[in-house]
């Protein structure tokens, strides 16, 4: 088995921590050293890279975890353009009269119902709710020792 790499704590150089525990150690050591923590900053490419604030820009420019995607200008809003429909009438759903419907006033005046948005809601059976609460369970029949349904 290969030995795990050891990292040096930026808050206390006497602390030598295995890489697998380094993130947890940084959080606890930051709390224990609030004065030193105010002078330090985390790299935006790797939270385990904690450097002095004055050296942060230099570190981020040369950080090994920096990728080409992050080098693009991500500070501005994302520009998205949607194609404009050329003819609005072609997109609308038209109501076609049904020959089976007769003797109804204004049958051709109402457009077809189209659901434009759907907000899903959690659907739960009442029996599931009762079981999760632990109450109102089916009572037992004392003669047969079987449960009766509450219908």
UniProtKB/Swiss-Prot annotation:
<keyword id="KW-0862">Zinc</keyword>
<keyword id="KW-0863">Zinc-finger</keyword>
<feature type="binding site">
    <location>
        <position position="49"/>
    </location>
    <ligand>
        <name>Zn(2+) 2</name>
    </ligand>
</feature>
<feature type="binding site">
    <location>
        <position position="43"/>
    </location>
    <ligand>
        <name>Zn(2+) 2</name>
    </ligand>
</feature>
<feature type="binding site">
    <location>
        <position position="9"/>
    </location>
    <ligand>
        <name>Zn(2+) 1</name>
    </ligand>
</feature>
<feature type="binding site">
    <location>
        <position position="15"/>
    </location>
    <ligand>
        <name>Zn(2+) 1</name>
    </ligand>
</feature>
<feature type="zinc finger region" description="CHHC U11-48K-type 1">
    <location>
        <begin position="6"/>
        <end position="33"/>
    </location>
</feature>
<dbReference type="Pfam" id="PF05253">
    <property type="entry name" value="zf-U11-48K"/>
</dbReference>
<keyword id="KW-0479">Metal-binding</keyword>
<feature type="binding site">
    <location>
        <position position="63"/>
    </location>
    <ligand>
        <name>Zn(2+) 2</name>
    </ligand>
</feature>
<dbReference type="GO" id="GO:0044877">
    <property type="term" value="F:protein-containing complex binding"/>
</dbReference>
<feature type="binding site">
    <location>
        <position position="29"/>
    </location>
    <ligand>
        <name>Zn(2+) 1</name>
    </ligand>
</feature>
<protein>
    <recommendedName>
        <fullName>Gametocyte-specific factor 1-like</fullName>
    </recommendedName>
</protein>
<dbReference type="InterPro" id="IPR022776">
    <property type="entry name" value="TRM13/UPF0224_CHHC_Znf_dom"/>
</dbReference>
<dbReference type="InterPro" id="IPR051591">
    <property type="entry name" value="UPF0224_FAM112_RNA_Proc"/>
</dbReference>
<feature type="zinc finger region" description="CHHC U11-48K-type 2">
    <location>
        <begin position="40"/>
        <end position="67"/>
    </location>
</feature>
<comment type="similarity">
    <text>Belongs to the UPF0224 (FAM112) family.</text>
</comment>
<feature type="binding site">
    <location>
        <position position="25"/>
    </location>
    <ligand>
        <name>Zn(2+) 1</name>
    </ligand>
</feature>
<dbReference type="GO" id="GO:0008270">
    <property type="term" value="F:zinc ion binding"/>
</dbReference>
<keyword id="KW-0677">Repeat</keyword>
<feature type="region of interest" description="Disordered">
    <location>
        <begin position="130"/>
        <end position="151"/>
    </location>
</feature>
<feature type="binding site">
    <location>
        <position position="59"/>
    </location>
    <ligand>
        <name>Zn(2+) 2</name>
    </ligand>
</feature>
<dbReference type="InterPro" id="IPR036236">
    <property type="entry name" value="Znf_C2H2_sf"/>
</dbReference>
């Amino acid at each position: 088995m290969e030995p795990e790499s050891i990292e040096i704590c930026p808050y206390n150089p006497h602390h030598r921590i295995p890489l697998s525990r380094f993130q947890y150690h940084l959080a606890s050591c930051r709390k224990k050293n609030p004065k030193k923590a105010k002078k330090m900053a985390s790299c935006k490419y790797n939270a385990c890279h904690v450097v002095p604030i004055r050296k942060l820009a230099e570190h981020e420019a040369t950080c090994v975890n920096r990728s080409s995607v992050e080098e693009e200008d991500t500070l501005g809003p994302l520009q998205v353009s949607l194609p404009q429909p050329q003819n609005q009438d072609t997109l609308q759903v038209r109501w076609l009269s049904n020959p089976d419907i007769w003797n109804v006033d204004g049958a051709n005046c109402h457009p077809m119902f189209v659901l434009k948005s759907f907000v899903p809601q959690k659907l739960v059976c009442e029996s599931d709710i009762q079981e999760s609460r632990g109450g109102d369970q089916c009572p037992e029949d004392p003669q047969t020792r079987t449960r009766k349904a509450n219908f």
